[in-house]
Swiss-Prot record:
The gene is ruvB. DNA binds at R313, R318. Belongs to the RuvB family. It catalyses: ATP + H2O = ADP + phosphate + H(+). This is Holliday junction branch migration complex subunit RuvB. GO terms for cellular component: cytoplasm; Holliday junction resolvase complex.
Length: 341
């Protein structure tokens, strides 16, 4: 159905980026979840402020929507320094990187999203910038080419990635602070939903917030996106307030089931069962059958399905689990005959 809620749109909808910014916490004190990460960051940030130095370079990795960008912004706020944002695909050539780096002031924070997508040549230029706060720029071409060394102000690079396994060892080794973000528990997500509802000036009952949280795939960005959609239903179909009944009605209308799975999740599981006898089957083959990008399946959908026990990785490919069969109301081929073999 064309009007089904696509879980990918919940990760950072372009037309709702302003809402995402409004709902972001601005300090470590206001940040919910990731307790160990937050406590360690408080120490590292305080130490850098006491020494009046740039914070060591930080690598944040984990599934989409867990707060990597938000934490990066908070770090800059806590340090009281400037914050510049770019991404790996945007930094196409060394000159692009040089332009960003030379614009930084002392102890500023540079956030590079999707840092695993940096081109090899740009990544090499980044090494000396991270280690020695300098870059070497080649002027002219051919016999007249010469290298000019440019000194940079001390800065903190925060790299964010959903696929840390794609980072090269030399780049990974240059991050002094390495932090993995985990999926959120329901209690924390419920607090986030209630906080966001308050900011959006909409009344949301505790049970309704729990219902939204339980279907948010452990991801704050999805919880906030679902809250905004439920708010729409509450205004049009109800009195504007969000209770459990309107929350359940809205989420069912969006085809988000009680596990937080959407239409593509269920289609993925069904495809493995119907076309590949439950697996094992390779990711590229699954992607072709679904008409989806393999990277999208691996980065966006698969982590949650694995975490919740619907699929598992094996040396021969992906397999669906008994939980997936039960969830879809299906039985394994030949299952009833086992007793009579």
């Amino acid at each position: 159905m064309e009007d089904d809620f696509d879980i990918r749109d919940a990760r950072m909808p372009e037309n709702e980026r302003e809402y995402e910014n409004v709902l972001r916490p601005l300090s470590l004190r206001d940040f919910s979840g990731q307790a160990k990460v937050v406590e360690n960051l408080k120490v590292f940030v305080m130490a850098a402020r006491m020494r009046k130095e740039a914070l060591d370079h930080v690598l944040l990795h984990g599934p989409p929507g867990l707060g990597k960008t938000t934490l990066s912004n908070i770090i800059a706020n806590e340090l009281g320094v400037g914050f510049k944002v770019t991404s790996g695909p945007v930094l196409d050539k060394p000159g692009d990187l040089a332009g960003v780096l030379t614009s930084l002031e002392k102890n500023d924070v540079l956030f590079i999203d999707e840092i695993h997508r940096l081109s090899p040549i740009v990544e090499e230029y980044l090494y000396s910038a991270m280690e020695d706060y300098r870059i070497d720029i080649v002027i002219d071409k051919g016999p007249s080419a010469r290298s000019i060394q440019i000194d940079l102000a001390p800065f903190t690079l925060i790299g964010a990635t959903t696929r840390s396994g794609l980072l090269t060892s030399p780049l990974r080794a240059r991050f002094g602070i390495n932090m993995h973000l985990e999926y959120y528990d329901m209690e924390t997500l419920t607090k986030i939903v209630l906080r966001s509802a308050n900011i959006l000036n909409v009344k949301c009952e505790l049970n309704a917030a729990r219902e939204i949280a339980s279907r948010s795939r452990g991801t704050p960005r999805i919880a906030n996106a679902l809250l905004r959609r439920v708010r729409d239903f509450a205004q049009v179909k109800g009195n504007g307030d969000i209770d459990k009944a309107i929350a359940c009605f809205s989420l069912e209308a969006l085809n988000i089931d009680r596990y937080g799975l959407d239409q593509i999740d269920n289609k993925l599981l069904t495809t493995i069962i119907d076309k590949f006898k439950g697996g094992p089957v390779g990711l590229t083959t699954i992607a072709t059958a679904l008409g989806e990008d393999p990277g999208t399946l691996e980065e966006v959908y698969e982590p949650f399905l694995i975490k919740e026990g619907f699929i598992k990785r094996t040396p021969r490919g992906r397999e669906v689990t008994d939980l997936a069969y039960t969830h879809l109301g299906r039985s394994r081929v030949g299952e009833q005959g086992f007793l009579f073999d």
